Amino acid sequence: MLTIALPKGALLNESIQIFQKIGLDFSAFLDSKNRQLQITDPTNQAKALLVRATDVPVYVEYGQAQLGIAGYDVLLEKSPDVANLIDLKFGYCRMSVAVPADSPYQSPLDIPHHGKVASKFVNCAKDYFRRLDIPVEIIPLYGSVELGPITGMSEAIVDLVSTGRTLRENGLVEIDELFASSARLIAHPLSYRLDRDQIYNWVEKLREPTTSMAKV
């Protein structure tokens, strides 16, 4: 039976919807009374695991799930050994550098050497500033990253931005974009090669709704 890792949080609703379009129903995860973390599709063709968004690539990499849905940001941050198969065309956001609106820094190049940057995307932030050849200290924060510059702990932050509302409400502005992110279908590489007949069919079915969405 096919096992799929689905992410908790912002990507869950649309992840379930896209599987519904190809005949797999995991909508029980959306029931407020549901406490199960593993459910089987009513047709008994597949089961789904409900896991933290950052853990989806882990379950896929270690073979506990053959397919999964993960944000491109998570894939860049974690660099898992998985096959990145399809851009699913939802969950759009961007990874940005932001500073206080009254900051003298108008560009990342203005951030002083050995300045401090708060982020929960430590690897993405390190890679970005390394490419710019700017030595900075990355401070790992895993909640309310905006408080870094507000409290004076950091000069800037690197974080995901969707509408930008949270930044604006906390007096922050974007000064650069690292990359755009969206939901991706990922697969366990060995399973995708060895069990290609089963997995390939599902992957091709998933390409159809995403192709249609791209044409709208």
UniProtKB/Swiss-Prot annotation:
Which pathway is this protein assigned to? Amino-acid biosynthesis; L-histidine biosynthesis; L-histidine from 5-phospho-alpha-D-ribose 1-diphosphate: step 1/9
Q: Which Pfam families match?
A: HisG (PF01634)
Which cellular component terms (GO) are annotated to the entry? Answer: cytoplasm
Q: Which domain of life is it from?
A: Bacteria
EC code(s) of this entry: 2.4.2.17
Reactions catalysed according to its record: 1-(5-phospho-beta-D-ribosyl)-ATP + diphosphate = 5-phospho-alpha-D-ribose 1-diphosphate + ATP
* Signal sequence segment: none
Q: Where in the cell is it found?
A: Cytoplasm
Query: A biological process (GO) annotation for this entry?
Result: L-histidine biosynthetic process
Coiled coil located at which positions? none
Task: Provide the function of this protein.
Answer: Catalyzes the condensation of ATP and 5-phosphoribose 1-diphosphate to form N'-(5'-phosphoribosyl)-ATP (PR-ATP). Has a crucial role in the pathway because the rate of histidine biosynthesis seems to be controlled primarily by regulation of HisG enzymatic activity.
Task: Relate the assembly described in the record.
Answer: Heteromultimer composed of HisG and HisZ subunits.
> What is the name of the protein in this document?
ATP phosphoribosyltransferase
Q: Which organism is it from?
A: Microcystis aeruginosa (strain NIES-843 / IAM M-2473)
Q: What is the lineage of its organism?
A: Bacteria, Bacillati, Cyanobacteriota, Cyanophyceae, Oscillatoriophycideae
UniProt gene name:
hisG
